Regions:
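Transmembrane and membrane-interface helices of multi-pass
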Residues: 4-242
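Short, flexible coil/linker elements and helix-boundary hinge sites characteristic
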Residues: 49-50, 149-150, 202, 237, ...
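Short coil/turn linker and secondary-structure boundary residues
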Residues: 108-115, 261-264, 546
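Membrane/wall-proximal cationic-aromatic binding patches
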Residues: 195-290, 297-315, 604
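Solvent-exposed soluble domains appended to multi-pass membrane proteins
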Residues: 263-605
Length: 605
């Protein structure tokens, strides 16, 4: 049978055309499968409802398959196609991992941060899913099919030109259909409003050529940030064409450069600057101890299936000198934990593309640490998130961390924090970074304290990790409360760096629903817990939805530094009027923060 197929294909140019079809179809199939698992739709019914949408959608998936398939006519060897498939698999699987973890797609800047995974590669296990196996399976089947196809006898440059011209024509048609379709059926779409805000002419005519979509949003319109553009591009076109597109974006709108603000931009920033930025900083009225709790969400603080996983945090909440906000919306971007640190320390939100800690680590930013004569960050994982630079960019005086190549578990972290507060002079500011509850929650898998029948493994491991960290945080709280020098003069803040269950995990959601657990993986919050005997005299329980950007202004009020020139873009959560009457929307807070960081505003103005 195989020999008959080879004989048939050996005549004329049949082998080349068969290879082209096989290669192009396999690439096309991978792109469609990726789209399905990310967006859960393939828009088939639109063929008779909205034909332009159908052409736009499938055309975007077909273009990269045609483009790559065309090179079959230039190379006689078949080996390169296997390499191409393997590289495509790596790109697709890497994006699936990143999307499952962050609901974002890889960018050029995030690819440059791969070294940050050092010591945390096992976290990928938590985001592995069976669909990832489909891509290497298709590659394997393609390799088997190659055995049935004879070697191409000659190059076909004319066929190559025809296929390239077809892909270019399809690109123009697809872009045109995208514009016409969105204008006709989705005028309420924010991206569409910007696309159709003015007629395309002159330089904007490039919109109709490959990567014109990138050019328009990166250069002409600048109406949306990178993440919104990337999501739109992958959904409307293909994750395969997104690979070169993300590099094109980085060329058209490079990240990491210091930008110049227009007078209009400066007017937007000025309302958030109070007084002279060079003025003398106020003296804090209390010491400050902040624990950035890795991946802490709010729901585990309550009882789960009759078990109390976090008794020490609950004990803090029962104390009359505590504040608890249980609905704090995570606002991190590509920087993940580093973004959480940025928000909590400086009151600024992260930049749109890339991680602030990498691209703008040399910027000196305002923070409550500037107000303290003694301050330190304790980092349990050296080299993580460029901590050796941003610690001093956030105006802390000292960085404490283990030797390179070593990591501290949370018990060792808390021991270091206790040692610091026992020996440092006052007033002091200490910021500790927890890591033991990092995915894949191995701390809770190796030696679980609780075993609950039927609970999904990852959920149980997560809860046991939190229980471990809660137990050592109890040691820190006791160390403060039992120290006469610190007991009434120290504020303790505990909050999560970000939420962790961000995808649609049906198994976890079903278990939570059956057992009346107040959580959904698509709608989770991180908590804010503050213990301050000097400032808080009666329990404060905030049930309104708040934001991570509210942590900084709340702390500034509690430590008595309200007169500091920078109060952040959030509000004090203890002020109910401010919570319900915010000066700006979340989107505007992102934009203002982006301008401040990327212009190095506090050094230049």
């Amino acid at each position: 049978m195989v020999q008959k197929v080879k004989t048939f294909l050996s005549k004329g140019n049949r082998a080349a055309w068969c290879l082209f079809l096989l290669f192009a179809i396999s690439i096309f199939l991978k792109g469609v499968i990726f789209h399905w698992f990310c967006f859960h739709s393939v828009i088939l019914s639109s063929l008779w409802h909205h034909p332009l949408e159908f052409i736009r959608f499938w055309g975007g998936k077909l273009i990269p398959a045609l483009f790559l398939g065309g090179f079959v006519f230039l190379f006689r060897s078949k080996t390169w196609m296997i390499y191409a498939h393997v590289l495509i698999d790596i790109w697709l699987i890497a994006n699936l991992f990143y999307y499952n973890a962050n609901a974002l797609f890889l960018s050029y800047e995030t690819m440059k941060m791969a070294d940050n995974m050092s010591g945390f590669w096992d976290s990928l296990y938590a985001y592995t899913e069976w669909s990832m196996l489909l891509y290497p399976i298709i590659t394997l089947l393609f390799a088997v099919c190659l055995l049935c196809i004879p070697k191409v006898s000659k190059r076909l440059p004319i066929a190559f030109c025809v296929v390239m011209s077809l892909s270019l024509l399809l690109s123009i048609i697809d872009n045109l259909c995208f514009k016409v379709y969105t204008h006709s059926w989705h005028p309420q779409n924010k991206v569409t409003e910007q696309v159709n805000s003015r007629m395309l002419s002159g330089e904007e005519f490039t919109y109709y050529y490959p990567f014109g979509h990138v050019y328009y949003f990166a250069v002409v319109s600048k109406s949306i940030d990178y993440n919104a553009w990337a999501y739109s591009y992958v959904r409307e076109y293909s994750v395969l064409s997104y690979f070169p597109a993300c590099f094109v974006w980085s060329i058209l709108r490079p990240a990491g450069e210091i930008i110049d603000l227009t007078e209009k931009d400066i007017e937007q920033v000025r309302p958030f600057i109070h007084g002279n930025i060079r003025q003398k900083t106020p003296t804090p009225q209390t010491n400050l101890v902040f624990v950035l709790f890795e991946s802490l969400e709010s729901w585990p603080i309550d009882e789960v299936c009759g078990y109390n996983f976090m008794p020490n945090l609950q004990a803090i909440l029962r104390n009359k000198h505590s504040l608890y906000c249980n609905k704090l919306k995570s606002q991190v971007r590509h920087g993940n934990s580093a973004d959480g640190q940025l928000i909590d320390i400086t009151g600024l939100l992260p930049i749109a593309n890339g991680a602030t800690c990498r691209l703008y680590a040399d910027n000196i930013l305002p923070s409550y640490a500037q107000c303290y004569p003694y301050s330190a960050i304790i980092n349990p994982a050296p080299g993580m998130w460029n901590q050796e630079k941003v610690t001093f960019g956030y105006q802390f005086k000292q960085l404490i961390e283990p030797q390179k190549g070593e990591h501290w578990a949370d018990k060792e972290l808390i021991d270091q924090m206790i040692n610091y507060i026992d020996t440092v002079k006052e007033p002091f500011c200490l910021f500790g970074i927890s890591v033991s509850s990092h995915v894949p929650f191995s701390q809770g898998s190796i030696n679980p304290t609780y075993i609950i029948d039927g609970m999904p493994h990852i959920m149980l491991a997560y809860l046991n990790c939190l229980h471990y960290t809660d137990s050592v945080i109890g040691n820190l709280v006791n160390a403060v409360q039992c120290n006469e020098r610190l007991a009434n003069n120290t504020t303790i803040v505990i909050s999560g760096d970000h939420t962790i269950f961000r995808g649609e995990d049906q198994e976890i959601d079903t278990f939570a629903d059956i057992h009346d657990i107040n959580m959904q993986t698509t709608h989770t919050y991180t908590p804010l817990i503050i213990y301050s005997p000097k400032k808080i005299k009666n329990n404060i329980y905030v049930t309104d939805t708040c934001y991570q950007m509210d942590i900084y202004p709340t702390i500034m009020d509690i430590i008595g530094c309200e007169e500091y020139f920078w109060k952040g873009v959030g509000v004090n959560v203890m002020d109910s009027a401010a919570r319900n009457n915010r000066p700006i929307l979340e989107k505007d807070a992102y934009d203002i923060s982006d301008m401040i960081i990327r212009s190095n505003y506090f050094n230049l103005h």
